[in-house]
Every structure is written in C-alpha cells, then in structure tokens.
C-alpha cells in the first residue's frame, strides 16, 4: 500500500512539475505572442480602448482618439480623411493598422521602450496609458493643393525639401475615408473594406510609395544624363545621333522619337537639346554605348533597388538586370520593365538639386509624450552621394533649359529659375499614357523638389497637365 501511495505521489509530483514547467514556458517565452494574438479579447480592448496619441500637421490634429460609449472606450477619428489617408493609414479593430498608424504604433499607443517611465508615472498617478503624439513634416497648404490637383483623376504628387529630406506633401488619388475602417461596428467595417478592396482603382494604395509602381518614362533620362557625364565619354558639347527611328538590335522593332515634337528637326543633338525636347533615340544610343552595367549602377546610386523607410515602407524601384540590347534601349527611356514610385522620381530631382547628395526622405518631425517631453526629433540625414557636384550642376543646367526652352515650359514660374523634366510612359495598348513631371525650384537655391504623375492620360494633354501642376506647386511654396 505504502509503495502504491508513494507511486501515486510521485506521479502527481511529476504532473505538477510538468504543468509548472509548461506554464513557466508560456509565461516567459510565449507571453508576447499570446498578448498580440488577434483573438486575445483582453489585449484587443486594451490596445483599442486606450487613448491613442494624435497625428499632427502644422499644430492641428488630423488623427485623434475621442471618448466613446462602448467597450473600446475610445474612437479613432480622422479629420480631412481623404486628403491624408495615404499618410495616416487607418487604425481598425478588424483589419489592424496601416500608414503612420502602423509604422509608429508603439509610440502612438504608449507602449514603446522609450515610454517606459511615462507608463510607470501614469500607473502611480492612477491615469490610464496615453500615447505619444506624432508631428509630421507635411505642410497642410501644400498637401491641400496637391490633393486638389489630383481630384477626379488617378495619380500621385510628392513634394520634398531637397536640402533636408522633409516630405512637404504626399497625395494619392483616388483616396478613401479611414473613419469607416476605424468604426466599432464590425459588420459595417467589413462591408466598407470589402468594397475598397474590390474597387479596380485601388484607393487603399498610397500610390506615392506603394502598390503598383510606374514606368518613369522620360524622367529616367535624368539618370541617363548623369551616367553619360560620369563615364567621361560625353560632355556638354557631345553630339549624338538622333534618328527619327532607332532599329532595336536583334529585333524587327524600332524605337521612335515623338513625331510631332522638335526632335524631328535634327538628325544629331547635344544631350542638353535632346533632354529639353525629350528625344528618345539619343538616350538609347548613349545607353547602348555605355552598357547595362553603367546605367544600372547609376540608377542604384539614385535609389533604384534600395530599401527605404520614411518611416512608411516604400516599395523598391527597379531597374531590370540581364537585358538584351533591345531591352536596354527601351529601359533607357523609362520603358520596358523599369518600375518606380513618385517618391523615387522626386528623390532623383532632389539629389540633382542638392549637388548630387541625396537626403533621406522623412515624414516625421517629432514624437512627443502626453506631458510634452520629446521622444524623438527629426534631423536631416544624408542617405547617399548619387553623383558629384560637378555632374549635378551640369544636369541641373540642362533641366533648367528644359523649362526655359523645352517641352517642360509649362512649369515655368515668372522671375524664378525652374529646373524640370517631363515624362510620358506608355501603358499597354490602350493609347493612354502616364504623364510625369519632376523638377525643383528655385534652381539656384532649391526649396522644393517634386514629382507629379497622372495615370491614363492622352498624350496630347499629358505634359500640359503635369507641368501645370508643377507650376502651381512651385508658386505655392515660393509665394508667387
């Protein structure tokens, strides 16, 4: 009997030790995973039921948490929602978060490591956790203008300070209302989200940095021009063949210049003139001469193929590898499989504007706790050297000529030296194009660098539309 009792006690002790070991493992190793699990109701209410910090532009809250009369305690509210949706994203109890709401979730929710002492102070004072506020670099007036310029069309506008990297505007169209996804009625949230995801115009995409990337069209010729100068084989006096049609090696296809432009008036051209008139064949000839490796290396130095967070994650721009000569010729004019974001195009112009130095783009000016102590504050950060001062200055001069004497003239501002480049990217066989403009102003002391893209535009009106948008953005910043 004693042996049976001892055996029973030993078995019970083993079971107890096993249970304690399992519980300890869960407590120390799986606790974080269980806390963050989507079916943890307590964690859900804690996260969505605390007073989340505000997102602020020019001293005004564009996202805030207000008291609600339900189990969540607080409702996330977005003012001017469509104008800022691509930046703020949404904070949803059903679908999680996107945009700044996601990128700075720990700071906004008050759970970041840097807010530990803040949480302790709130605990002893009996106050509930309150998140930090996030102030953006965006200028509200410029963001409003960018959003208005896109109304009724698909596309994106990015504006930044080329000397600091601060993003001054980032608009995407069509947009959506994040208030509908932040609602506490699960059925209505699911219905609205489903409608948005099924919309063929993809309003949930922030076209400036993510979603479907674009062919850059002739804006890529800025990179070709840099590669040409860096190679030492070309300078401002170099003359390149400018045939109306360039036979693509190994194919029965030709690469044409635009029939109705000035390109047809010359059989040879300098890089400056070819850039101003946006002739295709001289730049294809340059790329074929320099080779894929040189064009690819130059694109990489401007950001193609590089990871980037602003702190929103940016889709990589891509310059393809292992191309045939025919494909390289098409890629040199921003076609074939070259893909980019409007932010990348703006960064390219910004690097030229800033003497070849590319500053890291950033959306966040500061993060401050509820007692106004600063957790982090923006300071300009060099991202990379894209090219030399000498090369940048030469390309800048060519871009100024594109506005003064070329097809980018619609972006000109009276009394201001403006640098710019248009682009037209063919999309399939629809006959429609994506129309680009990128540039900066004033050219001799740049305050703003921009990229504008309109989707599905007729070639006859594209350049006029995109350059006019550029002109208005420049005038807004320069108070013209």
Q: Where are the regions that the model predicts?
A:
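Periplasmic/cell-envelope proteins involved in peptidoglycan metabolism and beta-lactam response
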Residues: 1-189, 207-208, 213-215, 293-301, ...
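Beta-lactam-recognizing serine transpeptidase/beta-lactamase-like catalytic domain environment
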Residues: 168-218, 223-455, 462
């Amino acid at each position: 009997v004693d042996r049976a009792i001892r055996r029973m006690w030993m078995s019970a002790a083993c079971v107890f030790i096993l249970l304690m070991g399992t519980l300890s493992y869960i407590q120390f190793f799986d606790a974080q995973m269980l806390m963050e699990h989507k079916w943890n109701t307590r964690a859900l209410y804690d996260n969505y039921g605390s007073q989340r910090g505000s997102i602020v532009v020019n001293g005004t809250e564009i996202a805030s948490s207000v008291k609600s009369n339900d189990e969540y305690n607080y409702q996330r509210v977005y003012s001017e929602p469509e104008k800022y949706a691509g930046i703020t994203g949404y904070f949803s109890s059903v679908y999680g978060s996107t945009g700044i709401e996601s990128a700075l979730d720990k700071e906004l929710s008050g759970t970041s490591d840097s807010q530990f002492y803040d949480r302790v102070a709130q605990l002893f004072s009996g106050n509930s956790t309150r998140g930090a506020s996030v102030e953006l670099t965006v200028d509200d007036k410029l963001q409003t203008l960018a959003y208005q310029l896109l109304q009724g069309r698909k596309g994106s506008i990015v504006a930044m300070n080329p000397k600091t990297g601060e993003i001054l505007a980032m608009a995407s169209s069509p947009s959506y209302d994040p208030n509908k996804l932040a609602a506490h009625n699960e059925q209505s949230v699911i219905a609205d989200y489903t409608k948005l995801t099924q919309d063929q115009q993809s309003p949930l995409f922030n076209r400036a940095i993510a979603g479907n990337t674009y062919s850059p069209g002739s804006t890529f010729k800025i990179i070709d021009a840099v590669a040409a100068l860096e190679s030492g084989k070309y300078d401002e006096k170099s003359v390149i063949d400018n045939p109306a049609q360039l036979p693509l090696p190994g194919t029965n296809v030709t690469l044409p210049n635009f029939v109705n432009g000035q390109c047809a008036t010359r059989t040879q051209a300098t890089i400056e003139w070819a850039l101003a008139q946006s002739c295709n064949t001289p730049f294809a000839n340059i790329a074929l001469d320099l080779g894929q490796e040189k064009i690819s290396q130059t694109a990489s130095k401007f950001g193609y193929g590089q990871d980037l967070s602003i702190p929103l994650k940016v889709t990589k721009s891509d310059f393809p590898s292992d191309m045939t000569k025919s494909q390289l010729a098409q890629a040199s004019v921003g076609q074939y499989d070259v893909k980019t974001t409007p932010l990348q195009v703006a960064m390219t112009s910004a690097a030229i504007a800033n003497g070849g130095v590319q500053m890291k783009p950033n959306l966040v000016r500061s993060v401050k706790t509820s007692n106004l102590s600063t957790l982090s504050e923006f300071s300009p950060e060099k991202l990379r050297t894209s090219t030399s001062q000498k090369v940048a200055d030469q390309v800048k001069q060519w871009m100024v000529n594109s506005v003064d004497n070329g097809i980018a003239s619609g972006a000109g501002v009276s009394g201001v030296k403006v640098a710019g480049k248009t682009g037209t990217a063919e999309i399939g066989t629809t006959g429609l194009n994506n129309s680009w403009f990128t540039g900066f102003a004033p050219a001799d002391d740049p305050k703003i660098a921009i990229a504008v893209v309109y989707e599905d535009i007729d070639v006859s009106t594209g350049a006029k539309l995109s350059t006019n948008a550029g002109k208005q953005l420049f005038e807004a910043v320069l108070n013209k």
